[in-house]
């Protein structure tokens, strides 16, 4: 696997020097300062690439080229935004960058309720609490019909949880959900959030799939023409939330994608921490079935709690993800490609990490502190080395 590291650009508290010392050789980056829907100019791409290469690293993966909400709802200037997206892909390929991670999640990117969940060892993790999320939906957002998405017991627990919250806790919960986590391209006020959700009235899973298919049928031929690999990121969490459909959550969704646009350019990001939240997702089976379409991996683990829809981010080798067999399956795919004359490694980044040690005293991007990811990368690297020695050499 190619060892990579997500870097948020010149304002990231983790420097490129830190990245190189962590042992990564590739950088996962995006031009976050360019508004959604606008073309990424060649000169901007080359300028960022030069910064990365000056540090002795390679810009391996773009994460992400965000998809404008108009494309997802097929409203407004969606056709113009699709043309802009095509041009950005051409520009990236012209600059020698050939792997793009993206997602098709409506309104929100990845979602958590607690950004400072204290683990038994004192480190801090990210957490999604189903009951707190219900409290937000029912009492802060006041989404019509939200009760139908929860069990009677969950509604009762959410009512009690909200009643016990201080104003500061309510504000923090709201901010965690709608203000935009690292990598999310948009944050909202509560009024803007309600309006954005309303844009999806009448858009169910079938309709969102229709819009996604339209996007893919326009984008993938361009990607194929310029030699670029598109790697869709799964929904996080991988289930409908806020009354919004989710369409990249299961192995069935992956199968639908490859059948809808059967092109080698139409591929996946295997994010074990996202897919792995669902107990019915067999990660190893996913990798084995769609290995030839996996162009990027995010390796992390989560741990489902008593309510299986509540989870926290575990240590990279702990939790519910069988990291040993996941890495083994990825290496088997790399070996298969090598045997067929395609020796390029699959980029892997240690996804998220606990805030620990000195990072507990620093301002960090939630999930993206340095030391937790350093630990995760070292652990995964060790698993990879042991597997290679045992099975591939």
UniProtKB/Swiss-Prot annotation:
Q: Which residues form a coiled coil?
A: none
E.C. no:
4.2.1.8
According to its UniProt entry, the protein's GO biological process terms are:
D-glucuronate catabolic process
Q: What UniProt keywords apply to this chain's record, in alphabetical order?
A: Iron, Lyase, Manganese
Reactions the enzyme catalyzes:
D-mannonate = 2-dehydro-3-deoxy-D-gluconate + H2O
Quote the pathway field. Answer: Carbohydrate metabolism; pentose and glucuronate interconversion
Which Pfam families does UniProt cross-reference here? UxuA
Q: GO terms for molecular function, please?
A: ferrous iron binding; manganese ion binding; mannonate dehydratase activity
Look up the record and name the cofactor or cofactors this protein needs: Fe(2+); Mn(2+)
Q: Which SUPFAM superfamilies match?
A: Xylose isomerase-like (SSF51658)
Identify the InterPro entries for this entry. Man_deHydtase, Xyl_isomerase-like_sf
**What NCBIfam families does the record tag this protein with?**
PRK03906.1 (NF003027), uxuA (TIGR00695)
What family is this protein classified in?
Belongs to the mannonate dehydratase family.
Q: What does this protein do?
A: Catalyzes the dehydration of D-mannonate.
Official protein name in the record: Mannonate dehydratase
Q: Which organism is it from?
A: Tolumonas auensis (strain DSM 9187 / NBRC 110442 / TA 4)
Q: Source organism lineage?
A: Bacteria, Pseudomonadati, Pseudomonadota, Gammaproteobacteria, Aeromonadales
């Amino acid at each position: 696997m190619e060892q990579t590291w997500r870097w948020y650009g010149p304002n990231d508290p983790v420097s490129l020097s830190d990245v190189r010392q962590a042992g990564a050789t590739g950088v996962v980056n995006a031009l976050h300062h360019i508004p959604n829907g606008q073309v990424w100019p060649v000169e901007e791409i080359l300028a960022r690439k030069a910064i990365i290469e000056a540090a002795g690293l390679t810009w391996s993966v773009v994460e992400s080229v965000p998809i404008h909400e108009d494309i997802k709802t097929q409203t407004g200037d969606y056709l113009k935004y699709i043309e802009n997206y095509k041009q950005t892909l051409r520009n990236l390929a012209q600059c020698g960058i050939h792997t793009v991670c993206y997602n098709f999640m409506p309104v929100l990117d990845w979602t958590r309720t607690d950004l400072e969940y204290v683990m038994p060892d004192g480190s801090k993790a990210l957490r999604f609490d189903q009951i707190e999320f219900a409290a937000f939906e029912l009492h802060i957002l006041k989404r019509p019909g939200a009760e139908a998405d929860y069990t009677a017991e969950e509604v009762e627990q959410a009512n009690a949880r909200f009643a016990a919250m201080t104003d500061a806790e309510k504000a923090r919960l709201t901010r965690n959900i709608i203000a935009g986590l690292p990598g999310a391209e948009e944050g909202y006020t509560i009024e803007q959030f309600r309006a954005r959700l309303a844009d999806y009235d009448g858009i169910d899973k079938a309709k969102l799939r229709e819009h996604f298919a339209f996007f893919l049928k326009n984008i993938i031929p361009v990607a194929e023409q310029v030699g670029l690999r598109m790697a869709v990121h799964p929904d996080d969490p991988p289930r409908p939330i806020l009354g919004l459909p989710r369409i990249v959550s299961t192995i069935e969704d992956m199968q639908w994608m490859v059948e809808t646009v059967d092109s080698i350019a139409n591929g996946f990001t295997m994010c074990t921490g996202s897919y792995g939240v669902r107990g019915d997702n067999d990660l190893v089976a996913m990798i084995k079935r769609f290995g030839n379409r996996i162009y990027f991996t995010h390796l992390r683990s989560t741990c489902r709690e008593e309510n299986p829809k509540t989870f926290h981010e575990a240590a990279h080798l702990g939790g519910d993800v069988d990291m040993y067999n996941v890495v083994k399956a990825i290496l088997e795919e790399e070996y298969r490609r090598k045997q067929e004359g395609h020796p390029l490694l699959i980029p892997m980044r240690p996804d998220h990490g606990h805030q620990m040690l000195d990072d507990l005293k620093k301002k960090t991007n939630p999930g993206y502190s340095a030391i937790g990811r350093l630990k995760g990368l070292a652990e995964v690297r060790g698993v990879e080395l042991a597997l290679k020695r045992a099975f591939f050499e």
